[in-house]
A protein has these predicted regions:
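N-terminal (or domain-start) structured segment
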Residues: 20-109, 157, 174-200, 208, ...
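Immediate post-signal peptide segment of exported/extracytoplasmic ligand-binding proteins
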Residues: 17-31, 80-85, 140-150, 210-211, ...
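C-terminal lobe and pocket-closing loops
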Residues: 205-272, 301-304
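An extracytoplasmic/periplasmic, membrane-proximal ligand-sensing/linker region
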Residues: 26-28, 170-172, 257-318
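Hinge/capping helix and adjacent helix->loop/strand transition within the periplasmic-binding protein
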Residues: 78-85, 99-182, 186, 234, ...
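N-terminal secretory signal peptides and thylakoid transit peptides that target proteins
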Residues: 1-14
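Solvent-exposed coil/turn segments that connect beta secondary-structure elements
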Residues: 92-94, 120, 130, 204, ...
């Protein structure tokens, strides 16, 4: 079970938020989810429902997948001034993809107002149950011996799964064939159909591992996944890499601070609601609460780190 930190518990309000200004919210709030429906992305649908109850107004989840999770943030960045009725998930790719483009669609530090940091993902590599590979070491050895012959699905070019696999390939002399898709449900279907040899993704694959359809070979966290304690981490197999792709919610630039506070104060108890905590736990997603000020500072550091990584690896998308 995910156990929130003492600081986070003390920060959790005991009552519904005081609204920032008269009349807010005065219509449904759109929550942009930059992934396909299904799997791990659906925790945001539950969060929207719980936050809407706190606000006394419907929060409508809206899936806008594409461009490795950056189509949704691009829609938010287009708004010249936020009024609180449009928010969305900002995945780590929103810091990475702009650094890979000559003409990025948005500036992650100029075009968003940071509302609340939520969590991260548990990544891993899965194969079908009938795959000849029973361990990660076997798969990696085959990729080394057969460069470019082992294909893997990811949720998109520039995604955390893609970047990590390319780093593994480069550092271990094991070139893989990358096949990008739009999200977790697509990557799972690709593996089910035999279109790829394996999938590198966050825990959208959990139900299919639990029912025996897929086999989990390795996870990418600092420690073993709670749900799969028998599965080793990359570090345990000799690869010094940890990836968990932290994320939160943001509003458009220039959103009134009072509106940001009202949104935050509705989302914070929703984040810690036992029903939402149970869903995070189901997908091995860590609780990583940060308020607006702390999240803004974290986003600035993340933007610097991701830009440096892109330059170091020479990654381009145009």
């Amino acid at each position: 079970m995910i156990r929130p930190t003492r600081r986070a518990l003390l920060a959790t309000p005991l009552a519904a938020p005081a609204l920032a200004q008269s009349g807010f919210p005065n219509r449904p709030i759109r929550l942009i989810i930059p992934w396909l429906p299904g799997g791990v992305a659906d925790h945001l649908r539950l969060l929207a429902d719980l936050a809407g109850q706190n606000l006394g107004q419907t929060v409508v989840p809206e899936n806008r997948p594409g461009v490795s999770g950056t189509l949704g943030p691009a829609l938010i960045a287009q708004e010249p001034r936020g009024d609180g009725h449009l928010i969305g998930q900002i995945p780590i790719t929103a810091f990475r993809i702009p650094a890979m483009l000559r003409r990025p669609p948005f500036d992650p530090m100029a075009d968003f107002t940071w509302v609340i940091h939520l969590s991260g993902y548990c990544f891993g590599v899965v194969v079908r149950q009938d795959s000849p590979f029973t361990t990660w070491e076997e798969l990696l050895a085959h990729a080394k011996a057969n460069p470019g012959r082992i294909s893997y699905a990811s949720p998109g070019s520039g995604s955390s799964a893609h970047i990590a696999m390319e780093r593994i390939a480069e550092e271990n002399g094991a070139p893989f064939l990358h096949v990008p898709y739009r999200g977790g449900s697509d990557t799972a279907q690709a593996l089910l159909s035999g279109a790829v040899d394996c999938t590198a993704d966050s825990t959208s694959w959990v139900p299919l591992v639990r029912d025996g359809t897929f086999r989990l070979l390795v996870t990418w966290g600092a420690g073993r996944a709670r749900s799969f304690p028998e599965v080793p981490t990359l570090r345990e197999t000799g690869i010094d890499l940890v990836s968990d792709s932290p994320f939160g919610l943001a509003a458009p630039k220039n959103t009134d601070p009072g509106v940001v506070r009202a949104l935050h104060d509705a989302l914070r108890p929703a984040l810690f609601d036992p029903r939402h905590v149970e869903m995070l736990d189901r997908f091995d997603m860590p609780m990583r609460y940060m308020g607006p000020e702390e999240y803004t500072a974290f986003a600035r550091r993340l933007n610097e780190e991701e830009g440096a990584a892109v330059r170091r690896l020479g990654l381009r998308m145009d």
